[in-house]
Design a protein with these regions (language model features):
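Positively charged, low-complexity terminal tracts
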Residues: 1-82, 86-113
């Protein structure tokens, strides 16, 4: 258990061997509910090489003085990461949906909203 966000690691060992290693992290929010974004790599057990980096966004709840993982979402490829970036930039662009403008007029049927 971790009492602080600094104590949380995304590294993971299997039978004493590091199979997931944290490369970097960004704390997105702090408090009773904290959100941390991790950049990490996983070991390919067949080739003994590290696979392409992935991203995990993890929500933690502080309960009885310790942070406990509540949920997570993995971004598994650069293509998926770039699609997420493009959508957020579009939504928050001047005049975009999140910026109070009409934004993109896609309907639910063609992938919007």
């Amino acid at each position: 258990m971790a009492e602080t966000l600094d104590e949380i690691s995304y590294d993971y060992e299997d039978e004493g061997r590091l199979v997931r290693r944290e490369i970097s992290r960004e704390v997105l929010s702090k408090g009773a509910w904290a959100t941390v974004m991790f950049l990490f790599e996983e070991l390919d057990k067949k080739t003994e090489t590290w696979r392409a980096p992935k991203i995990a966004i993890v929500r933690y709840k502080k309960w009885q003085g310790n942070y406990r993982k509540q949920s997570s979402f993995n971004i598994s490829s650069e293509k998926q990461a770039r699609a997420i970036i493009a959508a957020i930039e579009n939504w928050y662009a001047p005049g975009g949906k999140a910026a109070g403008g009409p934004g993109d007029d896609q309907s639910e049927e063609d992938g919007g909203d």
